[in-house]
Amino acid sequence: MTKNFRFEKDSMGQIKVPSEALWGAQTQRSIINFSIGEELIPIELIYSLTVIKRAAAISNFKLGLINNVKKDLIIEACTEILDGKHDSQFPLKIWQTGSGTQTNMNINEVISNIAALKTNSGLGSHHPIHPNDDVNKSQSTNDTFPAAIQISVVTQIIKKLVPSIKELTKVLDSKSNKWKDLIKIGRTHFQDAVPISLGQEVSAWSKQLKDAEDALIISLNELCFLPLGGTAVGTGINCPKDFSKESIKSISEYTGLFFYKSKNHFSLMASHDRLAQVMGQIKILASALFKISNDIKILSSGPRSGIYELIIPKNEPGSSIMPGKVNPTQCEALSMVCTQVMGFEYAVSIANASGTLQMNEYKPLIGFNILTSIKLLNHAISNFRLKLVEGIQPNPKTIKANLENSLMLVTALVPKIGYEKAAEIANLAFNESINLKEATIKLGYLTANEFEDAINTNKMI
């Protein structure tokens, strides 16, 4: 037994810890007490907490609270974690304490034990770096964990999600420009409407995504104000003056992003309105993508019995029973991701509303849902672009046939003959299965030349 385990001690006594594990007693207790699901704390959140620990060590050294040796050992340990060398040492689930305390201690213990290995002091010795007294100095989970969520969300959106959106809109803009002169029938209420160019139709998708991106970036502004330094309840107990300012400066330098000290720590620890707001903008992005994917599904329906104005890439067989079938699978995958994100947003809203007094006790759930949404959308958008949008092509023959066969071209006659006569033409054409020109001449409202001059689709867009 002693071969596979070592004994570590915390304020509750001794506990067995796997002999090679870099975590300690409090992490092990969490593993035992919260055997729920498989959803781990996102590694991006672990890294952001590690950035905070690194910044805290620098600040504590500058303020004379730890010596140079301890500072360097903590920084070295943080560097190894941020390089991805110890990802397996963070095994905790999101289903734990609502403050994230066990994850904060998980990081504190791992940093302590990395330092112990470097100095041949033995795992679990808490020497020369103590997880609480050194790594966690001047901090509380209650200010570091929400700050880490904010840092990781801002970082992942700016460095991962926004570039994916930009790449997709770039491709859509290219398609829009290429198809600007390809006139097709527009549709409202799933019924024929007046003409529009395919380029104009695609431009709507691009603009919708650009607007969602802009709103998302704007929502990050308030998220850059961190509650670091508020410690337990926002008052800053046990946190020296200038610690927050110095730490946030180090965080900004390390991440290359601008973060600032919050003017009111209490609000950012008791509630997470700003995170909920960002999640709301992520949901709006998801709703835009959902709409675009549905449009493409409709326009590519067929190939013989649907609209079939767009031809999607043939990526894989679509059916196990129907040979030759090609399905809009990328649209379906993206739609499912968007559906999940919308559900996550609802959970974040409830979680944000459910905090009590000086603490919101749903932090791991909020962090997980937002970061998972960012990751899912990032991957789904890239896949959607590469496997569908870049290869999508128009079907000019079907587009032309649908346009010429539409009764709604009669709208162009309204300025010449009025609404009622135009409606009469459309009804006659439909009832007798003739075209608009034939119906117009039959009713004697216009000559053939007058009709041709009025029904010029190039003038309708």
Curated annotation (Swiss-Prot):
CDD domains: Fumarase_classII. Involved in the TCA cycle. Catalyzes the stereospecific interconversion of fumarate to L-malate. One of its GO terms (biological process) is tricarboxylic acid cycle. Gene3D superfamilies: Fumarase/aspartase (C-terminal domain), Fumarase/aspartase (Central domain), Fumarase/aspartase (N-terminal domain). Keywords: Cytoplasm, Lyase, Tricarboxylic acid cycle. This is Fumarate hydratase class II. It comes from Prochlorococcus marinus subsp. pastoris (strain CCMP1986 / NIES-2087 / MED4). The keyword DNA-binding does not apply. The active site is at 189 (proton donor/acceptor), 319. InterPro entries: Fum_hydII, Fumarase/histidase_N, Fumarase_C_C, Fumarate_lyase_CS, Fumarate_lyase_fam, Fumarate_lyase_N, L-Aspartase-like. The lineage of its organism: Bacteria, Bacillati, Cyanobacteriota, Cyanophyceae, Synechococcales. Its EC number is 4.2.1.2. The gene is fumC. It catalyses: (S)-malate = fumarate + H2O. The keyword Lyase applies. HAMAP family: FumaraseC. Substrate binds at residues 99-101, 130-133, 140-142, 188, 320, 325-327.
